[in-house]
């Protein structure tokens, strides 16, 4: 299974109908979630440098998808460790990537990073998620836009409703 992932309709990061959003298209291939990132200076923290909080937000979303695609668990961020190695520049192309690593008791552990097209890593987050409790799965799934999603991936998401 691989291809375009559905997006949470209201997401600032991924929602296609959000005029103010980033409209990132999340992609999946076995054991890896990724998206292409090239943002303008509306999102800078310093001149020509993307705000670190925005970089973190992108990587947090990548981690969520990486966990879901490998575990079918709807997780929530509990703890993170973020490192910035180089400034992430506005107007420059990057790829944000993430992978599920393992489950330890109730902790779901994953990582995500932002790299350039040569593979140099600019930022990385190690994350610990926990499965959400008492979430109405149907309400959650109904908030997704599957219009660009590959049929096999759509079926994977909708299988939560069975």
Indicate residue ranges for each PLM-predicted region:
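A generic structural signal for short beta-strands and their flanking turns/coil linkers
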Residues: 20-22, 31-35, 52, 76-80, ...
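HotDog/MaoC-like acyl-thioester-processing domains
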Residues: 1-3, 89-90, 101-162
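Hydrophobic residues in beta-strands and at strand termini
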Residues: 37-39, 84, 131
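A conserved, well-ordered hydrophobic junction motif at loop->secondary-structure transitions
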Residues: 36-58
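Non-catalytic linker/capping segments at the edges of enzyme domains
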Residues: 1-41, 142-162
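Hydrophobic beta-strand-centered segment that forms part of the acyl-chain substrate-binding groove
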Residues: 61-95, 101, 126
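Short beta-strand micro-motifs enriched in acidic
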Residues: 27-29, 99-103
């Amino acid at each position: 299974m691989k291809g375009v992932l559905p997006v949470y309709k209201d997401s600032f990061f991924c929602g296609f109908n959000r005029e103010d959003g980033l409209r990132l298209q999340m992609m999946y291939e076995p054991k890896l979630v990724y998206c292409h990132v090239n943002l303008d200076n509306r999102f800078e923290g310093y001149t020509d440098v993307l705000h670190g909080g925005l970089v973190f937000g992108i990587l947090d979303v990548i981690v969520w998808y990486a966990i879901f695609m490998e575990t079918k668990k709807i997780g929530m961020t509990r703890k993170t460790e973020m490192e910035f190695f180089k400034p992430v520049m506005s107007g420059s192309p990057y790829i944000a990537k993430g992978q599920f690593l393992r489950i330890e008791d109730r902790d779901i552990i994953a990582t995500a990073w932002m790299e350039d097209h040569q593979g140099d890593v600019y930022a990385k987050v190690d994350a610990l998620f926990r499965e959400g409790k008492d979430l109405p799965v149907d309400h959650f799934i109904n908030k997704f836009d599957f219009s660009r999603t590959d049929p096999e991936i759509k079926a994977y998401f909708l299988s939560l409703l069975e």
